[in-house]
Design a protein with these regions (language model features):
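C-terminal transmembrane helix end/exit motif
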Residues: 2, 35, 70, 146-151, ...
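Alpha-helical transmembrane segments of polytopic membrane transporters and translocases
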Residues: 34-35, 46-63, 92-95, 135, ...
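Alpha-helical transmembrane segments of multi-pass membrane transport and lipid-handling proteins
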Residues: 91-120, 171, 178, 277, ...
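Hydrophobic alpha-helical transmembrane segments
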Residues: 130, 159-208, 225, 265-267
């Protein structure tokens, strides 16, 4: 009974820590979305969303799920209290994120004309995609730093990195959108991703390791489990990312960029803002589950506890969105975005079933 109460407290503690971070991130995201809605309108939001969904799809294809699988390897190494073992796993992870990051960069750069044609129906955005290819490398390297912090249970550092990254990203984006309007979207995405990398790296370097030589053979041997498990874990995420991209690309090709912007706005309210609750909870959940994965009884108990708390938190939030949907849309965006009210109400119902 005492262990159960302690587990609930741990879940609430981690969720509160990252819940606070996510609330702050939501505020930053709301401000950014409001600025885009006012300065760039639905068209600007549509273009930004298409760029993001396209690079996310390529990233999902090339990152091999290291952002998830490597947490387990680092958590297991941490449990051994063997500094040599920990340093070896960290070294392998850092090599893998560089390799997979460059893979994403090269693939996006080479396929830029095709991506532009598929996404926008023309090749006018080829140069933009080639510039954005560098964000695939920055994002994967940032993911590697975050995995290190999460696996080593340095959750406060991870929270601080996310907080600072959100603020810096906003401060970078606003002037670019104000002065360059739609032309500022690509520079804002590139500079923001680079800033996030620098911030995450500044925190991860505080984790002390011992000098360790890791051969190419050891890198392949150690990295094989990360890549194999990561690829399997990433399949479900890849399907979700691909579906998100296909929907946006379809809307872009059959409708207009304004329609894509409206869809992005509706999805952001439920899928991103409310969905951040799941992100906050998963930050502590996965490392804890990895630590007890061999004990089916404890793993089952932890999963049930996590589901109960998810319903407890998300239920009231969804009720608020359902009641004040129209007011929320006008406040978060503008009157131009009111057609998404129906979408929000149906999405809220789906989000509840996701929590259950």
């Amino acid at each position: 009974m005492a262990d159960s109460r302690s587990s609930y407290r741990q879940i609430f503690k981690a969720t509160s820590l990252f819940g606070g971070v996510q609330v702050f991130n939501i505020i930053i995201s709301i401000i950014r979305s409001k600025i885009i809605a006012v300065l760039l309108g639905p068209t600007g939001m549509g273009i930004s969303g298409l760029f993001t969904s396209t690079t996310s799809l390529v990233g999902s294809l090339t990152n091999f799920g290291l952002g998830t699988s490597a947490v387990r390897n680092i958590s297991e190494a941490r449990e051994t209290n063997d500094k040599g073992r920990i340093s070896k796993v960290i070294t392998v992870l850092r090599r893998l994120v560089w390799i997979t990051g460059f893979l994403g960069l090269l693939l996006t750069f080479i396929l830029a004309p095709t991506l532009s044609k598929l996404t926008f129906g023309n090749e006018n955005y080829t140069i933009a995609f080639r510039w954005l290819s560098i964000t695939l490398l920055f994002t994967q390297l940032t993911s590697g730093q975050n995995v290190l912090l999460q696996g080593m249970r340095q959750l406060k550092f991870l929270a601080q990195a996310n907080l600072i990254g959100s603020v810096v990203g906003l401060l970078i984006s606003v002037p670019l959108y104000y002065f360059y309007r739609i032309d500022g979207i690509v520079p804002a995405l590139i500079i923001s991703s680079f800033a996030s990398l620098i911030i995450a790296w500044s925190f991860s370097k505080r984790i002390k390791t011992v000098p360790t030589k890791v051969s190419k053979r050891e890198t392949l041997s150690e990295g094989k489990s990360m890549l194999t498990m990561g690829f399997m874990l990433s399949l479900s995420g890849l399907i979700t990312t691909a579906a998100s991209y296909i929907i946006r690309a379809y809307i872009s090709n059959t409708g207009s960029l304004d329609d894509v912007g409206l869809y992005n706005a509706g999805f952001a309210i439920i899928g991103s803002y409310v969905g951040l609750v799941f992100t906050a909870m998963s930050t502590d959940y996965y490392p804890r589950l990895s630590g007890i994965a061999q004990n089916n009884v404890k793993a089952k108990e932890l999963m049930n506890q996590q589901a109960e708390i998810a319903l407890f938190i998300i239920g009231p939030i969804l009720c608020i969105f359902l009641i004040f949907a129209n007011w929320a849309v006008i406040l978060l965006y503008s009157t131009k975005f009111t057609p998404i009210n129906g979408m929000i109400q149906w999405s809220a119902l789906g989000m509840y079933f996701k929590a259950a």
